[in-house]
């Protein structure tokens, strides 16, 4: 079996990551997607918004993907990749506070099962420059630096 492509969706809080994931899930086509959602809050709103479009939504709520839940992320990705039949792709939506580097590393540690297909960073047009200039928000800069694609959201507001 060829490694399953993983699309990592990052972006700072409120940028529109879940909206983008929902659009990916609604895109017609004969494909099965697995979705992993990282939520830091007590209520996993993002997972609830996914609705029934996803073939499998796994919510990681015990911490940020970039640090405390790396083992849980690896376990969840491995389990999802081994579902029969396996998904055609896996979408991982990080919390807005995540440095994507460790998540990329986790995918790289599973080369027989997974390959990083894209790192998409969603940037809110109204707040992006301010966030990138804030020295305390290195995660925002890192999300943009590592992105293979940047989607500018809310440009019409």
Residue locations for each model-derived region?
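GTPase G-domain guanine-specificity segment
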Residues: 132-136, 144, 154-157
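Nucleotide-state-sensitive switch-loop elements of NTP-binding domains
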Residues: 2-10, 15, 19-140
